[in-house]
């Protein structure tokens, strides 16, 4: 099972936590980051098989900031932690940029908050940017924007962020690197009879009972946050592997199909999960009417909706809102996330993408609704 899932994964999110990225909290572990960068580059280049698109979610900014500021212990005051994050993020980004460049790879720093992914317009902007970076062969290095929010420092973790990013880019797999070999039936540091869980269903309630409590004083996430992250990633069809980050060539060996760590299998296909998400959680804000040619292509081929095929726009919606796509008779063909607000969409009706910049003053997506954000109506 692990061989099939990881071998076939073409888009992967890798999350690495503070306890691995840092030298026991005393700044960044340069050798470890260099080693993961080497493996990331191998995956992107396809050194041992098919080329992959890889996103890195990395903690470590606060620990690096503490080192640069000369602090021995982790402060409790929120604004001190935010200041440390601001100082340390400089070093974290620089370290990844240096190590990936040594491997001939480009990198990009992306700072996100949970609010960015909860807002539909910002969600689409973040998604478009990340997918563009992946198409360019660049490795995005993502961290929580600790300087402007409190939630991650106080309660949250980058395991959750890793799962949200997996959902955002529709990853095939999430790999969480940790300081444990994987998920055990009990805490192996306290129970010598604890056994490694090789494979389970993501979302199995029994896993949470096994997971135990909080993590180290360096990071905030324990095994329970990884279980919950795997459950969240499974909601969009991504399976999760929890593995020891110090295992030699761990990433390369995983994508080659070697059974390392614990595999938590998603039970939902990606397309099914996306349909369920759009059907259950998003409110219809407006609609566009399309001509017969566009309607036929949508129904038969599931193509993206281009403005040139639109004849009318109904309602007042914003970029990122859910809209219906209707034929001339009013029958609903599909629903999807709008790349343009209603006022802009009206300007783009019947227009080719080559005219967008002249009409809008900027050039963005060529589609009104991208096929990845489009769900055909039942019976279409």
Curated annotation (Swiss-Prot):
It is an enzyme of class 2 (transferase). It catalyses: L-glutamate + ATP = L-glutamyl 5-phosphate + ADP. One of its GO terms (molecular function) is ATP binding. Substrate binds at residues 59, 146, 158. CDD domains: AAK_G5K_ProB, PUA_G5K. Keywords: Amino-acid biosynthesis, ATP-binding, Cytoplasm, Kinase, Nucleotide-binding, Proline biosynthesis, Transferase. Residues 285-363 form the PUA domain. One of its GO terms (cellular component) is cytosol. InterPro entries: AceGlu_kinase-like_sf, Asp/Glu/Uridylate_kinase, G5K_ProB, Glu/AcGlu_kinase, Glu_5kinase, Glu_5kinase/COase_Synthase, Glutamate_5-kinase_CS, PUA. ATP binds at residues 15, 178-179. One of its GO terms (biological process) is L-proline biosynthetic process. Transmembrane segments: none annotated. Pathway: Amino-acid biosynthesis; L-proline biosynthesis; L-glutamate 5-semialdehyde from L-glutamate: step 1/2. It is found in: Cytoplasm. Its EC number is 2.7.2.11. NCBIfam families: proB. Belongs to the glutamate 5-kinase family. Catalyzes the transfer of a phosphate group to glutamate to form L-glutamate 5-phosphate. PANTHER family: GLUTAMATE 5-KINASE, ISOPENTENYL PHOSPHATE KINASE. This is Glutamate 5-kinase. It comes from Verminephrobacter eiseniae (strain EF01-2). The lineage of its organism: Bacteria, Pseudomonadati, Pseudomonadota, Betaproteobacteria, Burkholderiales.
């Amino acid at each position: 099972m692990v061989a099939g899932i990881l071998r076939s994964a073409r888009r992967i999110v890798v999350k690495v936590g503070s306890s691995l990225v840092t030298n026991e909290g005393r700044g960044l572990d340069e050798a470890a980051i260099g080693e993961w960068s080497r493996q990331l580059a191998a995956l992107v280049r396809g050194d041992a098989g098919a080329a992959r698109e890889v996103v890195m979610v990395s903690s470590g900014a606060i620990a690096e900031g503490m080192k640069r500021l000369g602090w021995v212990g982790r402060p409790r005051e929120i604004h001190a932690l935010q200041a440390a994050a601001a100082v340390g993020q400089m070093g974290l980004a620089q370290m990844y940029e240096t190590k990936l460049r040594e491997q001939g790879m480009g990198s990009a720093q992306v700072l996100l908050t949970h609010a960015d992914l909860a807002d539909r317009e910002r969600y689409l902007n973040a998604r478009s940017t990340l997918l563009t970076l992946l198409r360019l062969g660049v490795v995005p290095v993502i961290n929580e924007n600790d300087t402007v929010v409190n939630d991650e420092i106080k309660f949250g973790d980058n395991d959750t962020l890793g799962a949200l990013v997996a959902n955002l880019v529709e990853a095939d797999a999430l790999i969480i690197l940790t300081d444990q070999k994987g998920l055990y039936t009990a805490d192996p540091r306290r129970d010598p009879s604890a056994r490694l869980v090789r494979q389970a269903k993501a979302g199995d309630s029994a896993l949470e009972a096994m997971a135990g409590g909080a993590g180290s004083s360096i990071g905030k996430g324990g095994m329970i946050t990884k279980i919950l992250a795997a459950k969240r990633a499974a909601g969009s069809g991504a399976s999760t592997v929890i593995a020891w980050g110090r295992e030699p060539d761990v990433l390369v060996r995983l994508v080659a199909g070697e059974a390392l760590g614990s595999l938590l299998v998603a039970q939902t296909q990606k397309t099914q999960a996306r349909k369920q998400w759009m059907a259950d959680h998003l409110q219809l804000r407006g609609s566009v009417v399309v001509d017969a040619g566009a309607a036929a292509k949508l129904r038969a081929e599931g193509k993206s909706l281009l403005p040139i095929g639109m004849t009318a726009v109904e309602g007042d919606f914003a970029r990122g809102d859910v809209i219906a796509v209707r034929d001339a008779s009013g029958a609903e063909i599909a629903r999807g996330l709008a790349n343009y607000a209603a006022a802009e969409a009206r300007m783009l009706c019947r227009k080719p993408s080559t005219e967008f910049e002249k009409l809008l003053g900027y050039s963005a997506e060529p589609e009104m609704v991208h096929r990845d954000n489009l769900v055909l109506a039942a019976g279409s």
